[in-house]
């Protein structure tokens, strides 16, 4: 099974204060756009020869850091720890959304991995519960469970859906590659 995690833009990003925990409070509009990565999940038989419960591969744009820190792996392990019946899997991420660009590509990948596992293995978790798991992965991850225009506050984890349709407009996104 494959899903295509889209990214988002922030409209009117306003940093309202610095928090004691090192994060910033913000007020912004998260708007999903159709620029996507791809996450594929293939279940393996429980008697597979892999020692790990997940075999992860990646293509496309490179992702800095250790593979073990990839948010897709973290999402799989988060659910696997709570639902031990989830079988071992082959997981592949094809990355087209640049990292560190403020587009939420990594957050989308984590949230969509939760959605993918929920659907593929019939966990039947409601959106509220998936959002709670997503928040453990990152502040803006719950947005991608909803994946509709939202007014976001706090660290980005507090969202309120907005009736905003910008489909009649075109966007030019420039990534200067400075991150």
How would you label these PLM feature ranges?
Residues 75-83:
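Short, basic phosphate-binding NTP loop
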Residues 89-102:
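Short pre-catalytic strand/loop immediately N-terminal to key active-site residues, enriched for Gly-Thr
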Residues 72:
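Globin-like tetrapyrrole-binding proteins
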Residues 2-5, 12-28, 122-179:
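ATP-dependent small-molecule kinase catalytic core of the GHMP/sugar-kinase superfamily
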Residues 11, 86-91:
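A short coil-to-beta-strand element that immediately follows conserved catalytic motifs
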Residues 1-55, 59:
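N-terminal, positively charged, Ser/Thr/Ala/Gly-biased leader segments
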Residues 101-127, 143:
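DPxDG-like acidic metal-binding loop motif
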């Amino acid at each position: 099974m494959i899903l295509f995690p889209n990214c988002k833009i922030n409209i009117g990003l306003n940093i309202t204060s610095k928090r004691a925990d090192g994060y910033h409070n913000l007020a912004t509009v998260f708007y999903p756009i159709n620029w996507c990565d791809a996450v594929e999940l293939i279940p393996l038989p429980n008697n597979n020869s892999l020692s790990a419960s997940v075999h992860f591969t990646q293509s496309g744009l490179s992702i800095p850091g250790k593979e073990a820190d990839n948010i897709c792996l973290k999402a799989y392990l988060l659910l696997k720890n709570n639902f031990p019946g989830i079988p071992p899997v082959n997981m592949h991420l094809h990355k087209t959304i640049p990292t560190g660009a403020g587009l939420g590509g990594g957050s989308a990948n984590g949230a969509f991995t939760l959605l993918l596992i929920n659907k593929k293995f019939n966990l039947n978790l409601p959106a509220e519960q998936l959002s709670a798991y997503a928040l453990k992965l990152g502040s803006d991850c719950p947005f991608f469970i909803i994946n509709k225009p939202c007014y976001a506050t706090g660290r980005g984890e507090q969202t309120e859906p907005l009736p905003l349709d910008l489909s009649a407009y075109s966007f030019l996104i420039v990534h200067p590659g400075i991150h």
